[in-house]
């Protein structure tokens, strides 16, 4: 972090319109994968006043009641009444999903699964840093926790006048690559009309901001901006149109690392936009957990229909205990980054994706989950189970 003395990241709640779209797209993916693990899914969603539109390309033997599924996601988020401007029970649901192009399929599918080609060309990044216990940048971690707490306070009834839409932003101060303070906090939350701004700001400060952020990082000069424009009654898809894939920096590292541009939600693991980004995080996190570097960014790239990455690059920003070239060699020895191998390595053919679609895909805790007869582990790319083998291979 020597490049910046201040760094800011933002997050958005599950009720933000773009996140509604992401969650619907991943709910569709999960529902299909539950029945057909090898389905090809690319699902895009648009939400606006009174309507949810799902589109994209799917090749599967599964049958899913997509209208019912879309409505359930919207209602579970908290849009269950016209009073909040959007109601999953009464909104229109349009389904214009088609089939995957045969041209793409012939480039991806192989008789030997391990030779499966990448679903598209592209470049993906993974990142890890030792500045937090989850090996993620602090500004995005704190931003996620604020909007998670907003949803918790809303759903539990602690602050019943909160509505689903919210955004957060945190500015951290760094010295010698370590976080030494939080200089600014922004939290905008949708709310019912009857609550006063004074009551809202006091409650949000005490029960969300101070409850969530480390007290030792807050100081007398920290700036707090809670609903700085005043009223935030109109929100969600009424206030703004929501689209899948428009929060890719929120989904990843909050701007601290580079991004290849490909979104995650609605894409099955054959799409390297998603699976290779997850693999990149897995590699970078294990490198940092192994003590090979304090910070690590990895770039991988692919050509459509080709299994092997076209490049693997590493940058440890001068924090490496061994050279970046040596780490690249270790990565090639310890990780198979072909698309099929990534799917096997991270056990990605399970309905684990809707949970990733709010509050970040990285820095989360792997947990065992059961859907029907399928028991699996979520967020497998957050494991550090290869750190010791990397240390041994590096001679540390």
Swiss-Prot record:
PROSITE patterns (UniProt xref): ADOMET_SYNTHASE_1, ADOMET_SYNTHASE_2
UniProt superkingdom = Bacteria
Task: Name what cofactor the protein needs.
Answer: Mg(2+); K(+)
Stretch list, region Flexible loop: 100-110
Could you tell me which CDD domains the record lists for this protein? S-AdoMet_synt (cd18079)
Tell me how this protein assembles. Answer: Homotetramer; dimer of dimers.
Q: Name one GO cellular component term.
A: cytoplasm
Residue positions annotated to bind Mg(2+) are: 18
Localisation per UniProt entry: Cytoplasm
Residues at which ATP binds: 16, 165-167, 240, 246-247, 263, 267
Would you kindly state one Gene Ontology biological process term found in this protein's UniProt entry? S-adenosylmethionine biosynthetic process
Pathway(s) per entry? Amino-acid biosynthesis; S-adenosyl-L-methionine biosynthesis; S-adenosyl-L-methionine from L-methionine: step 1/1
Q: Which HAMAP family match?
A: S_AdoMet_synth1
Q: Which GO terms describe its molecular function?
A: ATP binding; magnesium ion binding; methionine adenosyltransferase activity
Give the similarity note: Belongs to the AdoMet synthase family.
Q: What does this protein do?
A: Catalyzes the formation of S-adenosylmethionine (AdoMet) from methionine and ATP. The overall synthetic reaction is composed of two sequential steps, AdoMet formation and the subsequent tripolyphosphate hydrolysis which occurs prior to release of AdoMet from the enzyme.
Where along this sequence does the record place binding of L-methionine?
A: 57, 100, 240, 271
Q: How is the cofactor bound?
A: Binds 2 divalent ions per subunit.
Residues given in the record as K(+) binding sites:
44
Q: What is its EC number?
A: 2.5.1.6
Instruction: Name the chemical reaction catalysed here.
Output: L-methionine + ATP + H2O = S-adenosyl-L-methionine + phosphate + diphosphate
Transmembrane region(s):
none
Q: What keywords are assigned to this protein? A: ATP-binding, Cytoplasm, Magnesium, Metal-binding, Nucleotide-binding, One-carbon metabolism, Potassium, Transferase
Gene behind the chain: metK
The name of this protein is S-adenosylmethionine synthase
What Pfam families is this protein classified in? S-AdoMet_synt_C (PF02773), S-AdoMet_synt_M (PF02772), S-AdoMet_synt_N (PF00438)
Q: Which organism was this protein described from?
A: Pseudomonas putida (strain W619)
């Amino acid at each position: 972090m020597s490049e910046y003395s201040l760094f800011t990241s933002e997050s958005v709640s599950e009720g933000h319109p773009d996140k509604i779209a992401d969650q619907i797209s991943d709910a569709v993916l999960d529902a299909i994968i539950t029945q057909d693990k090898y389905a090809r899914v690319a699902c895009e969603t648009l939400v606006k006043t009174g309507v949810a539109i799902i589109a994209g390309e799917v090749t599967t033997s599964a049958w899913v009641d997509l209208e019912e599924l879309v409505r359930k996601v919207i209602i579970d988020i908290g849009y269950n009444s016209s009073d909040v401007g959007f109601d999953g029970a009464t909104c229109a649901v349009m389904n214009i999903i088609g089939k995957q192009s045969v041209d793409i399929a012939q480039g991806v599918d192989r008789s030997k699964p391990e030779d499966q080609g990448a679903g598209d060309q592209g470049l993906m990044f993974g990142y890890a840093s030792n500045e937090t216990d989850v090996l993620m940048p602090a500004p995005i971690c704190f931003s996620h926790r604020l909007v998670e707490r907003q949803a918790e306070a809303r759903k539990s009834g602690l602050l019943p006048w909160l509505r689903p839409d919210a955004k957060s932003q945190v500015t951290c101060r760094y010295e010698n690559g370590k976080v030494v303070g939080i200089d600014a906090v922004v939290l905008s939350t949708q709310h019912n009309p009857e609550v006063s701004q004074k009551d809202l700001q006091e409650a949000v400060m005490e029960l969300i901001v101070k409850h969530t952020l480390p007290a030792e990082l807050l100081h007398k000069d920290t700036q707090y901006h809670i609903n700085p424009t005043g009223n935030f009654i109109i929100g969600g898809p009424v206030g703004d149109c929501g689209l899948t894939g428009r929060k890719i920096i929120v989904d990843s590292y909050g701007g601290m690392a580079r991004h290849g541009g490909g979104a995650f939600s609605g894409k099955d693991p054959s799409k390297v936009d998603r699976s290779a980004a997850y693999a990149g995080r897995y590699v970078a996190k294990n490198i940092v957990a192994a003590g090979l570097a304090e910070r690590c960014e990895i770039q991988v790239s692919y050509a459509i229909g080709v299994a092997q990455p076209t490049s693997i690059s590493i940058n440890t920003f001068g924090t490496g205990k061994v050279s970046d070239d040596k780490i690249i060699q270790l990565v090639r020895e310890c990780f198979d980054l072909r698309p099929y191998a990534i799917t096997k390595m991270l056990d990605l053919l399970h309905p684990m994706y809707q949970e990733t679609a709010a509050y970040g895909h990285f820095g989360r805790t792997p947990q065992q989950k059961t859907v029907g007869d399928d028991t699996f582990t979520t967020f497998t790319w957050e494991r550090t189970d290869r750190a010791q083998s990397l240390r041994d291979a590096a001679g540390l």
